[in-house]
UniProtKB/Swiss-Prot annotation:
The keyword ATP-binding applies. Catalyzes the ATP-dependent transfer of a sulfur to tRNA to produce 4-thiouridine in position 8 of tRNAs, which functions as a near-UV photosensor. Also catalyzes the transfer of sulfur to the sulfur carrier protein ThiS, forming ThiS-thiocarboxylate. This is a step in the synthesis of thiazole, in the thiamine biosynthesis pathway. The sulfur is donated as persulfide by IscS. Residues 63-167 form the THUMP domain. GO terms for cellular component: cytosol. This is tRNA sulfurtransferase. It comes from Shewanella sp. (strain ANA-3). The lineage of its organism: Bacteria, Pseudomonadati, Pseudomonadota, Gammaproteobacteria, Alteromonadales.
Length: 484
């Protein structure tokens, strides 16, 4: 069994050197991701496609491979195929017939062929021959070229016939690391998750910068969002997660800054700090989730004033998106439930915010800050490899317990993603098992029976530890981590 990875059309339009570089990078990215699923994964690059071979003795890996490929930037779509050899057009038909006889019975169908290589026939001739045979010697209703119920997709390359058994849509975009790195400001809300994802999809290695305004609970929640985005869409490359203790800045704003200017001043301080951190990391651009007119600090006038605080390029991919469109995208990429349970701290700072800030007035207000405030904040910022989030949680999860056995009055919660749970169901005789995906746990845990103890389970124990710590920070103490 094989997968044929089709390149995103924008890659195909590049010049030959650029196209080769992008394709080679995509091959490397695919290999990096799939090797974590199985060491025997084979990835081979061609001019216009990339082949992925599922080990013959491990056909069960096909679904896992397909799911991972669907989340790798730079891929238009993936087709799962079975491989056959052929000697003639009739030989092709004879091999297609037993595979599709039952599938097209009582249905309309058509045959579509894509061919590469030198042959004494063309694609249309194969479509007519195979389609005619299937129409004559099966119980199909007939051929329908437009909107058929079943499409028989065949690909021919040299003397090999590939029958397409499944088509998986890809992310599109460019392969990771074909663009320069960016530093994304992430709060855990709807907007910042989507803006981060859009730059991952565009091929930029996206590092995360979090301004902590709400203590450990806020940081844990944001780390879950960042880890989810990286693990799902950007796992092929290492990135950094930078946590900035921003409470001192907020304290000085509340104490010293005019109420109407607070929101704009806060954003300017964030941009200054992020720019300093980005420069240290060799990054040339900051990404934010700001959308025009969404809140008072996001008017054109205020955004202009905010941008004047630094020479660093500030990118706003959501600038013209409606809020509902952002939420819909948030739901699609799997960060909606995180965002729903994430507290919002920035919105309470200014009671009567200005929508037309004057640069001179803002700069005058900023002279009230302690001279070394930004320097102190930058020095206190902590940057970690995002892969270390799980290890870091291990050192902070002393308040909870990891268990291997299950006692009475304990319920196991399988927090894996639905498709992962379906592929490998957790079954424990005599034990109640609830299935609540990790991204819904924060919003649904409060509805559970508080008299019971809940054991969180996931395959590797990473997300279960993050979720346990998050729930403990929220005041729940009837939670443990289950590691059988």
């Amino acid at each position: 069994m094989k997968f044929i990875v089709k390149l995103y059309p924008e890659i195909m339009m590049k010049s030959k050197p650029v196209r080769m570089r992008f394709t080679k990078m995509l091959e490397t990215n695919i290999r990096n991701v799939l090797k974590k699923v199985d060491e025997d994964a084979k990835v081979q690059r061609q001019w216009d496609r990339i082949w992925v071979k599922v080990p013959n003795d491990k056909p069960e890996l096909a679904q896992a491979f397909g799911e991972r490929l669907a989340c790798i930037p730079g891929i238009a779509h993936v087709v799962q195929v079975d491989e056959y050899s052929f000697t003639s057009v009739d030989d092709i038909y004879q091999q297609v017939l037993p595979v599709y006889r039952d599938q097209i019975a009582g249905k309309t169908f058509c045959v579509r062929v894509k061919r590469t290589g030198s042959h004494d026939f063309n694609s249309i001739e194969v479509e007519r021959y195979v389609g005619g045979g299937l129409n004559q010697f099966t119980d199909a209703i007939g051929v329908r070229l437009k909107n058929p119920e079943v499409t028989v997709n065949l690909e021919i390359e040299g003397d090999k016939l590939y029958m397409v058994t499944k088509r998986i849509e890809g992310l599109g975009g460019f392969p990771m690391a074909t663009q320069e790195d960016v530093l994304s400001l992430i709060s855990g809300g709807f907007d910042s998750g989507v803006s981060s994802y859009q730059f991952i999809k565009k091929g930029a290695r996206t590092h995360y910068c979090f301004f902590n305004l709400g203590g450990a609970q806020h940081e844990i929640g944001v780390k879950q969002v960042a880890y989810h985005l990286w693990k799902t869409y950007g796992e092929s490359h290492k990135v950094k997660f930078v946590s900035v203790p921003f409470e001192p800045v907020v304290a000085e704003i509340l104490e010293k800054i005019d109420n109407g200017q607070m929101g704009v001043v806060l954003k300017r301080m964030m941009m200054r700090t992020a720019a300093r951190i980005a420069e240290r990391m060799g990054i040339q651009a900051i990404v934010t989730g700001e959308s025009l007119g969404q809140v008072s600090s996001q008017t054109l006038t205020n955004l202009n004033v905010i941008d004047r605080c630094t020479d660093m390029l500030i990118l706003r991919p959501l600038i013209a998106m409606d809020k509902q469109d952002i939420i819909n995208e948030c739901r699609r990429i799997g960060t909606e439930d995180f965002a729903k349970s994430m507290p919002e701290y920035c919105g309470v700072i200014s009671q009567k915010p200005t929508v037309k800030a004057v640069l001179a007035k803002v700069e005058a207000e900023e002279t009230k800050f302690s001279e070394d405030l930004i320097d102190r904040i930058v020095e206190q910022a902590v940057a970690i490899d995002i892969r270390e989030i799980a290890e870091q949680m291990n050192t902070r999860i002393t308040e909870t317990e990891t268990v291997v056995a299950i006692d009475t009055n304990e319920v196991v919660i399988d927090i894996r993603a639905p498709e992962e749970e379906e592929n490998k169901p957790l079954e424990i005789e005599g034990v109640e098992i609830k299935r609540i995906p990790f991204f819904k746990l924060a919003t649904q845990f409060a509805d559970l029976d508080k008299q019971k103890t809940y054991l969180l389970y996931c395959e590797r124990g990473v997300m279960s530890k993050l979720q346990a710590l998050y729930l403990i920070e929220q005041g729940y103490h009837n939670v443990k981590v289950y590691r059988p």
